[in-house]
Amino acid sequence: MIIATADFQHAQHGVAAVRAGKDAYIEKPLAHTMSDAQNIRRAVLETGKVVQVGTQRRSAANYQRAKDFIASGEFGDIVSVEMTWNVNQPGRWRRPALVEKLREEDTDWKLFLGNLPFEAFDPRKYIEYRLFWPYSSGIPDQWMVHQIDTVHWFTGLPHPRSVTANGGIYLWRDGRKNWDTMTAVFDYGPLNDATKGFQVVYSSRQTNSAGDVKELYHSNGGTLDLDKNLITGEGGLEESYGKAMGMKANQLRSRALLEKSGGVDSGAHAGVDEATSGNVRNWMECVRSRKMPNAHIEAGYSHSVALCMTIAAIQSGERVTFDDAKQQVVAGGALWPRL
């Protein structure tokens, strides 16, 4: 079963699918609340069904090569990561003509709401759900999870140690509630050793496309550019600066990460790219072999934790952490969401 419904429905439909004995491909985000994340994770582990999450970078050759390169040790310790996803598309996630035509009798509104509190029918929330919480968080649900998932994959870390976020609706004041511009800052590292780690800065805007989609991993020796698929010494320690401190130059040898990119198209009507088709193919192969797929349930759970932390940072304005014992998000020192 392929589940590509509204963001808030993914986990609920996934639970129903695996409990009914079906293997499932579940689009991202796996879940944007911790209760849904825990429910789908439990259901998959208890049923043993093959579940692939739609974070398709895990099935792209260039990202797989990047993971191997970092694991080899040649790159050195990650010191920072920069991620962007910028578009300039006023109609992104908008369907005004269809909204105008839709009537409640054309839908099963109560079924659509699932486990959300009841509210009166709203055609915008049915069709343009990505613009409205709690149906979606917008940018974090749709785009951030793709990119932050690579951090977990490349490092083996389960989730951020902390998240802060800022942003707003700065241009597209069309009745939406989810931000059109945001920046989130993540602290990553061993959960039991605060002396080690690195920062991830994620920024996204829907108001100007300069910068496009980028993921830049930095070490003291250089940069891993997953947009250009290059390993370079850019930013690495130069001899002139290291010499005064008794240090040698540390600059990576520049070369291509992979001859051919398996990247992801950020367009609104991109069709099927190599990464997506590869992710579906990997799932189908694992349905036959019963092996663990590339974007397995634990990967989905990890990106859901990072997503829930980010949503809490957006909604609370607080610094957000994660209570591993309780498997709950903490904002400003208290469990989130507030009861």
What is each of the regions a protein language model found here?
Residues 1-3:
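N-terminal Rossmann-like NAD(P) cofactor-binding module of classical short-chain dehydrogenase/reductase
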Residues 69-72, 150:
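A generic secondary-structure signal
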Residues 64-65, 77, 82-86, 91-236, ...:
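Contiguous beta-strand/loop segments that form the cofactor/metal-binding neighborhood of enzyme cores
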Residues 6, 11-59, 73, 317:
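Beta-strand-loop-alpha-helix segment that lines the small-molecule cofactor/substrate pocket
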